[in-house]
Curated annotation (Swiss-Prot):
This is Large ribosomal subunit protein uL2c. One of its GO terms (biological process) is mitochondrial translation. The gene is rpl2. It comes from Prototheca wickerhamii. GO terms for molecular function: RNA binding; structural constituent of ribosome; transferase activity. Belongs to the universal ribosomal protein uL2 family.
Length: 273
C-alpha cells in the first residue's frame, strides 16, 4: 500500500500524508457484523478522567472481528478487504461454506478470492490459523493466543509480526515485535503471516485537526501549567521543575521509572537474553 502526498496548498496539506486506499474493496461494511459504538472519552463509569488527552473524534461503527477463529475445519473465501476505523490493520470479510460471514485481520498478501481455513492440519499459507505445535520454526505469525481458546491477543496491529524461534515441552518461544522473547503454550493458536497495512507507521498527520479526528486531545506539558494543576507548574518564565526528578500529575516518579509489578506471574514466561 503506497503513501499519497498532496500539493502544498495549505500547511496541513504540505506536511501531511495519507495511505492509498486503491487496494480496498469499494463496499459498505457488512451490516450484521457492525454495531454502534459509544466512546468512553477517557472516563470511567463515574465520569471521572482515567486516561487523559482523550475525547471527541469522528463517529464510528464498530466492526466485530473474529480473533478466535473457532470454525475448525471449515474453509472460507475472502470476499473483500476493507478499512476499519477502530484499528490500524485492514480487515478481510470471509464467507464460510455454510454461508456465515466473519471479519478477520487481513495479513500481507491476502487477496480477494483466496481461501483461508482454521485447522490443526491446515497448510502453512498466509491467513490460515493453526496451533503452535503444528507451525514450523521460523514461521512468521500474528494474532497469537496467550491461553488456548481465549482468542488472539498478541501481534494484531498494522505491520506487526512474531516469529517462532524454539519449541520445548509444552512451550513455544516467540520473538515478539517489542523484541521480547516469550513462552507461549504450544496449544495456543496463531495465524500465519504478517499483519497488513505495512506503511501505516510512515504516514504523517500534518495538522492538529487529524489528531482530533482520532480522539487525541492536546498533551500539555506540566511545566506549562500553574502550580495548582501540576507539580511541575509555576515559576517565572521557563523555570525548572524544582525537584530532584520528574514526577507525574499525582506526584509519583515518572520518566524512566519501571512501572511493572516485580512479582507478576508472567515474569516467568519472559526470557531475558
Amino acid at each position: 500500500m503506497a503513501i499519497r502526498f498532496f500539493k502544498p496548498t495549505t500547511p496541513g496539506r504540505r506536511h501531511g500524508s495519507v495511505l492509498n486506499f486503491d487496494d480496498l474493496s469499494s463496499k459498505k461494511p457488512e451490516k450484521k457484523l457492525t454495531r454502534g459504538w459509544s466512546r468512553a472519552q477517557g472516563r470511567n463509569n463515574k465520569g471521572r478522567i482515567t486516561t487523559r488527552h482523550r475525547g471527541g473524534g469522528h463517529k464510528r461503527l464498530y466492526r466485530e472481528i473474529d480473533f478466535i477463529r473457532n470454525k475448525i475445519g471449515t474453509s472460507a473465501i475472502v470476499k473483500s478487504i476493507e478499512y476499519d476505523p477502530n484499528r490500524t490493520a485492514r480487515i478481510a470479510l470471509v464467507c464460510y461454506k455454510d454461508g456465515e460471514k466473519r471479519y478477520i485481520l487481513s495479513p500481507t498478501g491476502l487477496k480477494v478470492g483466496e481461501m483461508v481455513i482454521a485447522s490443526p492440519n491446515a497448510p502453512i499459507t498466509v491467513g490460515n490459523t493453526l496451533p503452535l505445535y503444528n507451525i514450523p520454526l521460523g514461521t512468521s505469525v500474528h494474532n497469537v493466543e496467550l491461553q488456548p481458546g481465549a482468542g488472539g491477543q498478541l501481534v494484531r496491529s498494522a505491520g506487526s509480526v512474531a516469529q517462532i524461534v524454539a519449541k520445548e515441552g509444552q512451550w513455544a518461544t516467540l520473538h515478539l515485535p517489542s523484541g521480547e522473547y516469550r513462552l507461549i503454550p504450544q496449544k495456543c493458536w496463531a495465524t500465519v503471516g504478517r499483519v497488513g497495512n505495512l506503511d501505516n507507521s510512515n504516514i504523517t498527520l500534518g495538522k492538529a485537526g487529524r489528531s482530533r479526528w482520532l480522539s487525541q486531545r492536546p498533551h500539555v506539558r506540566g511545566s506549562a501549567m500553574n502550580p495548582v494543576d501540576h507539580p511541575h507548574g509555576g515559576g517565572e518564565g521557563k523555570a525548572p521543575i524544582g525537584r530532584a526528578r520528574p514526577v507525574s500529575l499525582w506526584g509519583k516518579p515518572a520518566l524512566g521509572v519501571k512501572t511493572r509489578k516485580r512479582k507478576k506471574f508472567s515474569n516467568n514466561l519472559i526470557i531475558n537474553l
